[in-house]
């Protein structure tokens, strides 16, 4: 159980919220979060890398010169791996890098990662109604009022998508905007500071609570 102070758009205290999420035991927390992170990064790989073997490279069917009598080294194909333009030995081939992990474990890792970042988490009121039109400066100034240092990597979590918020945030190079349902291990661990709306935290408890 963790208690957070909720800040309004101006950075003033507007209430409190309690987050209750079941997390992994201390001795296994790092391991399960690490497994979930490795899974996410592995599953993001396309695995479409490919190289051609000597049998797949175009040409090379004819013996370049006779076996004996030329004084040159023996050669059976111009596509030998020893030749320029030849095939590749043990080169990369398309493969599936995906890693399986039980859903219960994935959610446990996500909850554990979120609670582990409690000291870096700032909770604010829903602010979409404060942005009547896309304005990057408004969001940048709000982050400063909420105590977020300039230049640090920020993960901004909202309950739902809002076009004005998205357009205002996308010009801030160090800020990543996601919704509560798109919460993931990498973004949680990669950010220096996490800013979440109170509604987003409630949705996280509803979706991932256990």
Swiss-Prot record:
GO MF term list: rRNA binding; structural constituent of ribosome
Record InterPro entries: Ribosomal_uL4 (IPR002136), Ribosomal_uL4-like (IPR013005), Ribosomal_uL4_dom_sf (IPR023574)
Annotated gene: rplD
Biased composition (Basic residues): 60-71
Protein name: Large ribosomal subunit protein uL4
Complexes and interactors: Part of the 50S ribosomal subunit.
Region entry Disordered, spans: 43-80
Family per record: Belongs to the universal ribosomal protein uL4 family.
Organism: Synechococcus elongatus (strain ATCC 33912 / PCC 7942 / FACHB-805) (Anacystis nidulans R2)
Keyword Endoplasmic reticulum among record annotations: no
């Amino acid at each position: 159980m963790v208690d957070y102070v909720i800040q309004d758009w101006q950075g003033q205290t507007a209430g409190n919220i309690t987050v209750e999420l079941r997390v992994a035991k201390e001795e296994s927390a790092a391991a399960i979060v690490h497994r979930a992170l490795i899974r996410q990064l592995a599953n993001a790989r396309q695995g479409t890398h490919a190289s051609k073997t000597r049998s797949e490279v175009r040409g090379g069917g004819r013996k370049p010169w006779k076996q004996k009598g030329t004084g040159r080294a023996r050669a059976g194909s111009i596509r030998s791996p020893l030749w320029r333009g030849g095939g590749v030995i043990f080169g990369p081939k398309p493969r599936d890098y995906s890693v399986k992990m039980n859903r219960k474990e994935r959610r446990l890792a996500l909850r554990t990662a979120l609670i582990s970042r409690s000291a870096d988490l700032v909770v604010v009121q829903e602010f979409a109604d404060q942005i009547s039109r896309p304005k990057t400066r408004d969001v940048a100034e709000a982050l400063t009022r909420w105590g977020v240092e300039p230049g640090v990597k920020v993960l901004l979590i909202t309950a739902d998508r809002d076009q004005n918020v998205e357009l205002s945030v996308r010009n801030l190079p160090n800020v990543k905007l996601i919704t509560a349902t798109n919460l993931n291990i990498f973004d949680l661990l990669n950010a220096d500071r996490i800013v979440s709306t109170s509604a987003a935290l409630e949705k996280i408890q509803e979706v991932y609570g256990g």
